[in-house]
Amino acid sequence: MSEWLFDLGNSRFKYAPLHGNRAGQVQAWAHGAEAMDAAALAALPSGQIAHVASVAAPALTQRMIACLQERFTQVRIVRTAAECAGIRIAYADPSRFGVDRFLALLGARGDAPVLVAGVGTALTIDVLGADGLHHGGCIAASPTTMREALHARAVQLPASGGDYVELAIDTDDALTSGCDGAAVALIERSLQHAQRSLGAPVRLLVHGGGAPPLLPLLPGATFRAALVLDGLATWATAAASP
């Protein structure tokens, strides 16, 4: 039976075949706030079951679901659950916990105790204990979003460009250093708190399209490009279990 995993984020769309309980080879496309590139839609696979997670705008999500319903016998939409595959979400109302964060924790379950940092449009941080208990987290603007926000308020500040240095001597480098440094500082502070709170070493997993530039500043981190899709694979496997 052909099953596929689909992750519709705020700015990128990823999909992969389900291989066992992991995601297979990943394909990714950028998308706008309300529209998907025609080439991306034409390239979509078809099969028996599509497992779909989305944090994109409702209109875009509905268009994508309608497109998949034409290609798949069954389309399953992921919702955050209070408990799943050995993890328990800390939120009193799990429906308010983003499905991307939920799936990232499922993908990271085998690495617990772990801090999971997702770097996309937002920077999300969540801590998962060895017993599968979610200890909460935080949300901030990612470095890319910080840059775009600064440019929107002060157009003379470029929205991109520059390299990270500890003390920059030009504006482009200063912006990159400040925004990347702010993200790294929040991740490091959260990791230190997690280790004190759990009383044990805590692994650091990072994922998302904005993560690679931060890796040189986080020498202890492991990058998992397909973490959300791996979590979606775990969800799909759990959903299929009797």
From Swiss-Prot:
Summary of the function given for this chain in its UniProt record: Catalyzes the phosphorylation of pantothenate (Pan), the first step in CoA biosynthesis.
BP GO annotations: coenzyme A biosynthetic process
List of residues binding ATP: 7-14, 121
Cofactor(s) listed: NH4(+); K(+)
GO MF, any single term: pantothenate kinase activity
Phylogenetic classification of the source organism: Bacteria, Pseudomonadati, Pseudomonadota, Gammaproteobacteria, Lysobacterales
Location of the protein in the cell: Cytoplasm
CDD domains: ASKHA_NBD_PanK-III
Catalysed reactions listed for this entry: (R)-pantothenate + ATP = (R)-4'-phosphopantothenate + ADP + H(+)
PANTHER family to which the protein is assigned, alphabetical: TYPE III PANTOTHENATE KINASE
UniProt remark on cofactor binding: A monovalent cation. Ammonium or potassium.
Listed GO CC annotations: cytoplasm
Subunit structure comment from the entry: Homodimer.
Highest taxon, organism lineage: Bacteria
Alphabetized UniProt keyword annotations: ATP-binding, Coenzyme A biosynthesis, Cytoplasm, Kinase, Nucleotide-binding, Potassium, Transferase
Catalytic activity, EC: 2.7.1.33
Residues annotated as catalytic: 100 (proton acceptor)
A Pfam short name: Pan_kinase
Record pathway: Cofactor biosynthesis; coenzyme A biosynthesis; CoA from (R)-pantothenate: step 1/5
Residues reported to bind substrate: 91, 98-101, 171
Listed name of the protein: Type III pantothenate kinase
Family according to the record: Belongs to the type III pantothenate kinase family.
Disulfide bonds: none
Chief location: cytoplasm
